[in-house]
Amino acid sequence: MTPYQNEQDGVSVGGKWLEFDSIEKMTGAKKVRFELLSDNYFREDPDYKPRVELFCVDGKLKLGDFNPGVKLPPPNRPGFWGQPQLQVMVRIDDTHYFKGWNWMRGHFLSMDKGTVRGLIGAQVFKVELPTRSGRQIAEFSPGGLNLDRVRQACDLTPKKPSKD
């Protein structure tokens, strides 16, 4: 069941991924949302799993977001243009690195395109971030995603992160 108005119920697109389709009423734009729920819960809310969502409009990626399902702490660094960011540690398969993701109203983080491209081709994806009850890790199993479907809907292909 989808939480968004005018969006069809999700269908499996391989592994633990779901795809939700809709049409924007005013513009007629085709919207596709891919969602991956984490394998675990955060301490603050044992009923809501953290999730990753990819939003695509008319065949292009518009936003990749990480929603932890808990209220985020204040931003801890400025971005390139001064927007507030939260630094997280990301693990994609056997590579890990720190990223500053844009902090969106204290509810979710906007991921960079490089991380999204690494995620869609990965078997292991983990995000460690500060929460109000200490550092926590969201663990995902992204393997099995139909990459042809993501390429059609978002013009996105996987890319392994560099180890340097």
Question: Could you tell me what each predicted segment is?
Answer:
Residues 1-164:
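A generic "folded-domain core" signal
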